[in-house]
C-alpha cells in the first residue's frame, strides 16, 4: 500500500513553522510522505532539512513596509509564486495540502484549489490575517486554535511539542516548592529589546524574593547581563536563547512574555501564570491571543505603552506562590493537549474522502 502524501505550507516565523513541524513528525510516524514548501533565508530553510523532510523553496514576499514599486509588482509576484507551487503539486501530486501560515500559504492555497487537491487551513492566532480569511472561503476544512476566529472552523488548539506536553501539571510541580519565586522572562526567540531595557531593574527591588531566568536574544546578551550586574547581585540567569524551553517552563512559577499564539498555547498546556506584554500590532493580535487567560484569572496583560519596571514590581509584590498556583491551575484548565492528534485525524479523514 502506497504512503499518503501531504504538502505542508509554512514559513517565515517559528509561530508557523514549529506547529507545522510537530504535525509533520506525527504524520511521519503514521507512514505519511511529507513535502514542505517555504522560502529561503527564513527559519524553515534551516530547520526542515535537518529533520529529513524535503523542502521546496519559492520566491515570495509580503506586503508589509513594501515600496510603491513592490506594491505595483504584487500581482505579478503572486502569480509567479502561484505558478511555482502549482508546478510542485503537479510533479508530486499530494493527497492533501495543509496551510499553517506565512507568505507561502496564499499562493499555496490557491494552487491547491486550482489543482482540486483538498486544502485544509490552520489559523494559530485569535485574529486571522487577510490571507487566511480569504483562503478560508476556498479551503476544504478550516481549523482554529482559539474560538471565534474563522467561520465554520473547528477548534483544535495549536500543536505543541511532546516534551512540553509531558511537563507535570501544576498540582505536581508546585507541591512542596519553596524558596524565592522563579520568574521566567522571554521576549520571543530573538528576545525583545524593551524587555532587556526595562526588566533587569526588577531584580534590584525584588532582591532575595526572586530568582530570574531571562532570555535576551543574542544581540542584547552582553548589554542585558551588564544591566543585571548594575542593578543587582541577586541570583539571575541571562541566556541568549533557552534551548530546552520545556525545562524553563517546568522550573518557573510565573512567566513574563509576549503573547504570540504558540507561547500562549504552550503556557495553557503547561499551566503557568503569566504577565503578558503583547507586541503592539495594529490589529491587537497578541493582545487578543492573551485575553481569554486574563478573563479567566490566569494572566495579567500590560499594554506596551503602559509597560514599566515599577508596574511589573507592583504586580509581582501582590503575588505569592499560592496565588501563582491558582493562576497556573486556571491556565491549565484552558489548555488543549491533544491538538496534534486532532489535526492528524482531520487530515486523515479529509484525505480519505477523495
UniProtKB/Swiss-Prot annotation:
GO biological process: carbohydrate metabolic process; cell division; cell wall organization; lipid glycosylation; peptidoglycan biosynthetic process; regulation of cell shape
Chief localisation class: membrane
Catalytic reaction annotation: di-trans,octa-cis-undecaprenyl diphospho-N-acetyl-alpha-D-muramoyl-L-alanyl-D-glutamyl-meso-2,6-diaminopimeloyl-D-alanyl-D-alanine + UDP-N-acetyl-alpha-D-glucosamine = di-trans,octa-cis-undecaprenyl diphospho-[N-acetyl-alpha-D-glucosaminyl-(1->4)]-N-acetyl-alpha-D-muramoyl-L-alanyl-D-glutamyl-meso-2,6-diaminopimeloyl-D-alanyl-D-alanine + UDP + H(+)
Entry membrane topology: Peripheral membrane protein
Protein's recorded name: UDP-N-acetylglucosamine--N-acetylmuramyl-(pentapeptide) pyrophosphoryl-undecaprenol N-acetylglucosamine transferase
Keyword Ribonucleoprotein recorded: no
Subcellular location: Cell inner membrane
EC numbers, comma separated: 2.4.1.227
InterPro entries assigned: GlcNAc_MurG, Glyco_trans_28_C, GlycoTrans_28_N
Keyword terms of this UniProt record: Cell cycle, Cell division, Cell inner membrane, Cell membrane, Cell shape, Cell wall biogenesis/degradation, Glycosyltransferase, Membrane, Peptidoglycan synthesis, Transferase
Protein family membership: Belongs to the glycosyltransferase 28 family. MurG subfamily.
GO terms of molecular function: UDP-N-acetyl-D-glucosamine:N-acetylmuramoyl-L-alanyl-D-glutamyl-meso-2,6-diaminopimelyl-D-alanyl-D-alanine-diphosphoundecaprenol 4-beta-N-acetylglucosaminlytransferase activity; undecaprenyldiphospho-muramoylpentapeptide beta-N-acetylglucosaminyltransferase activity
Pathway, per record: Cell wall biogenesis; peptidoglycan biosynthesis
GO CC aspect terms: plasma membrane
Record-listed UDP-N-acetyl-alpha-D-glucosamine binding positions: 13-15, 125, 161, 189, 242, 261-266, 286
Function comment: Cell wall formation. Catalyzes the transfer of a GlcNAc subunit on undecaprenyl-pyrophosphoryl-MurNAc-pentapeptide (lipid intermediate I) to form undecaprenyl-pyrophosphoryl-MurNAc-(pentapeptide)GlcNAc (lipid intermediate II).
UniProt-listed Pfam families: Glyco_tran_28_C, Glyco_transf_28
Matching HAMAP family: MurG
Amino acid at each position: 500500500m502506497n504512503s499518503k502524501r501531504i504538502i505542508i505550507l509554512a514559513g517565515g516565523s517559528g509561530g508557523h513553522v514549529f506547529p507545522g513541524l510537530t504535525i509533520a513528525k506525527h504524520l511521519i510516524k503514521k507512514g505519511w510522505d511529507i513535502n514542505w514548501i517555504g522560502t529561503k533565508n527564513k527559519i524553515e530553510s534551516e530547520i526542515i532539512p535537518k529533520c529529513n523532510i524535503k523542502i521546496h523553496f519559492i520566491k515570495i514576499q509580503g506586503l508589509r513596509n513594501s515600496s510603491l514599486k513592490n506594491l505595483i509588482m504584487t500581482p505579478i509576484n503572486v502569480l509567479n509564486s502561484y505558478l511555482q507551487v502549482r508546478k510542485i503539486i503537479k510533479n508530486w501530486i499530494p493527497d492533501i495540502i495543509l496551510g499553517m501560515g506565512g507568505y507561502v500559504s496564499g499562493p499555496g492555497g490557491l494552487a491547491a484549489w486550482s489543482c482540486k487537491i483538498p486544502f485544509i487551513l490552520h489559523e494559530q492566532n485569535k485574529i486571522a490575517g487577510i490571507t487566511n480569511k480569504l483562503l478560508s472561503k476556498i479551503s476544504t476544512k478550516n481549523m482554529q486554535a482559539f474560538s471565534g476566529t474563522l467561520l465554520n472552523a473547528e477548534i483544535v488548539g495549536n500543536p505543541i511539542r511532546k516534551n512540553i506536553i509531558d511537563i507535570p501539571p501544576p498540582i505536581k510541580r508546585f507541591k512542596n516548592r519553596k524558596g524565592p519565586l522563579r520568574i521566567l522572562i522571554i521576549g520571543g526567540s530573538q528576545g525583545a529589546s524593551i524587555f532587556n531595557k526595562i526588566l533587569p531593574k526588577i531584580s534590584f527591588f525584588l532582591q532575595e524574593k526572586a530568582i530570574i531566568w531571562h532570555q535576551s536574544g543574542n544581540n542584547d546578551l552582553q548589554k542585558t547581563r551588564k544591566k543585571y550586574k548594575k542593578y543587582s547581585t541577586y541570583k539571575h540567569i541571562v541566556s541568549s536563547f533557552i534551548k530546552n524551553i520545556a525545562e524553563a517552563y517546568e522550573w518557573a512559577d510565573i512567566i513574563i512574555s509576549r503573547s504570540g499564539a504558540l507561547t500562549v498555547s504552550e503556557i495553557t498546556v503547561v499551566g503557568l501564570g503569566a504577565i503578558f506584554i503583547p507586541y503592539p500590532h495594529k490589529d491587537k493580535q497578541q493582545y487578543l491571543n492573551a485575553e481569554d487567560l486574563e478573563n479567566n484569572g490566569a494572566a495579567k496583560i500590560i499594554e506596551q505603552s503602559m509597560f514599566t519596571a515599577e508596574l511589573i514590581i507592583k504586580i509581582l509584590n501582590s503575588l505569592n506562590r499560592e496565588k501563582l498556583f491558582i493562576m497556573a491551575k486556571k491556565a491549565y484548565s484552558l489548555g488543549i493537549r491533544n491538538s496534534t492528534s486532532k489535526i492528524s485525524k482531520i487530515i486523515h479523514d479529509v484525505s480519505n474522502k477523495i
